[in-house]
Regions:
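Membrane-embedded architecture of ER/inner-membrane glycosylation machinery
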Residues: 1-198
Length: 198
């Protein structure tokens, strides 16, 4: 039982320690990445403090200590130490690291949605599934019966501006459809289609 616990603890702690170091080494990683969205997402500068990797290091130390306790047949002490460490590590990681990862993965899209908050416009995501537009855009209630039809928003006779958040790896597909690029930030772009007055 003690060796699998040690291996698992060291594996998890290595991952937890390595992830915060992305900001330091992203310029070396980018040449090996083939996905345009991932590359563009890494252009975001998340504000790392520099000590987040210590959470993983702490878990590694605790894993080795617990392994030593298991080897000495002090199972309850080893298990208690592991449980307490996870009670510290998980909330610490959630508070200090996860928000910074969110900066790369979805913050630009959420900021786009928030910038449209309260405006009388249509807001949708294109090329990816998301419910963020419903939570963050707070747009005015829709009255047109076709507002839920993405094809109508893209090509139909819309009655107000339609804004779309698209991942950059799908950008070329949609800028051909009478959509205008407003801004690109990280791995996302904000597009708009204005109503045509007949």
């Amino acid at each position: 039982m003690s060796i699998p616990v040690l291996i698992f603890g060291l594996l998890v702690s290595s991952l937890l320690a390595a992830l915060p170091l992305i900001e330091l080494f992203k310029h070396k990683l980018i040449p090996y990445i083939k996905d345009d969205f991932a590359i563009a997402s890494l252009t975001i500068n998340a504000e790392w403090n520099g000590f987040e990797w210590m959470i993983g290091f702490f878990l590694a130390v605790v894993s080795v200590y617990s392994f030593a306790m298991f080897q000495k047949q002090q199972l309850s002490k080893g298990i208690f130490t592991l449980l307490i460490s996870f009670a510290i590590v998980i909330p610490s990681y959630m508070m200090m690291v996860v928000p910074k990862i969110e900066a790369y993965s979805q913050r630009p899209a959420i900021e786009f949605y928030q910038s449209l908050s309260g405006k009388d416009v249509y807001v949708e995501s294109l090329g990816h599934k998301s419910y963020a537009q419903y939570f963050y855009s707070n747009s005015e209630p829709k009255t047109h019966p076709s507002y839920y039809d993405i094809n109508w928003l893209l090509t139909g006779s819309i009655d107000k501006p339609a804004y779309f958040v698209v991942k950059v790896n799908h950008l070329n597909r949609y800028t051909k459809n009478h959509l205008t690029l407003i801004e690109q930030r990280g791995g996302f772009a904000l597009l708009v289609r204005y109503p045509v007055n007949d």
